[in-house]
Amino acid sequence: MLRAGVIIVQQFLSRIMDLLCACPPGHVPCLAVTGAGGKSSLAAGLSIHLSKAGHSGIIAPSTRIYMPRPRSCSPEEAQRLAECGIQTCDALLLRRGRSDRALSEELRAVLCTMDGVPRRLLPLPEKSSALCPNRALCLVLGEEVVRHSPRSKLRGLSPETICRLKQFLEKEKLSRRAVLLVEADGAARHPLKAHAAHEPQIPSCADLVVAVMGLDALGKPLATVVHRPELAAERLGVTLYAPVTPRMAATLLLHEEGPFRGTPSSARRIVLLNKTDVLDPSQGKLLDELLESLHVPGGPDEILLHGNNA
């Protein structure tokens, strides 16, 4: 039996959009995404949905992420890139050691520019004239660009800076809703992870925290599909080459030092189980076992499923 109070939803983007847009007028929702196996795809997909709904999405990672691409392609191409976890946005704003207020003022100027910004990914001037917002934008904020092979990375902002940006935006009373999307940890493209002592970097102002797991981790050796496998093996009390079971995955997702560590008490906690389409019919029981293992005291408020067959 499923635990009362847990909602299982398959249309995950629509559900998250509903939760974000249910916030009162003037409130700037903040979503933090943690875990592995689809964080970047979630952020990219949400930014597209926000734009379609007339809202401005502000990607403000608190960790390093791959550099997004300019939103100069067609909506169809942007959607395809999002499904690959590649973010496309209108502009990049870098803090580069400046004060939080300076970054906030630049952000306000961009959000309130009548003609929007050029559809190219370049740091904007530190000073811009403030007019009225005319269209929804997707912006990316970060500290600095770090050269990295094969793709450069963007070093994120501190959780404290992100919360100060949120407070600043709420005082501005923008005519379009702005939503902060925070990628709060990295997983080196693995579908599951064990979190180190400094992770995740969840802002104290987060309204929603979504912990992501890729279901393609189930049944495979821990050493090959888990980010920081040694740490995971230690926490689980298994060998490095033990196959990942549903109970093991649930233990990592709900561990006190796992993806929800540092979540504000007022925030809604959501688990997103990604890639349901990778499970063949004979593995359907694995998903059922994982859902049951997540339905425990202290478990998530909601479980969302995603995959081409969901």
Regions found by a protein language model. Name each.
Residues A22-G26, L124, S128-N134, F168-L174, ...:
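Solvent-exposed alpha-helices and their adjacent loops that cap or buttress functional pockets
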Residues L13-A53:
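Walker A (P-loop) phosphate-binding motif
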Residues L2-M17:
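N-terminal pre-Walker A segment at the start of P-loop NTPase domains
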Residues A43-G45, P68-S72, R151-S152, L222:
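Short, glycine/acidic-enriched capping/hinge loops at junctions between secondary-structure elements
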Residues M114, S149-L165, L174, V179, ...:
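Conserved catalytic-core segment of NTP-binding enzymes
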Residues V28-A32, S56-I58, A136-V140, R177-L181, ...:
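Residue-level preference for the first positions of well-ordered beta-strands
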Residues V33, I58-S62, V140-E143, L180-A184, ...:
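General beta-strand structural signal in soluble alpha/beta enzymes
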Residues S47-L139, E143:
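N-terminal phosphate/diphosphate-binding loop that engages ATP/GTP or pyrophosphate donors
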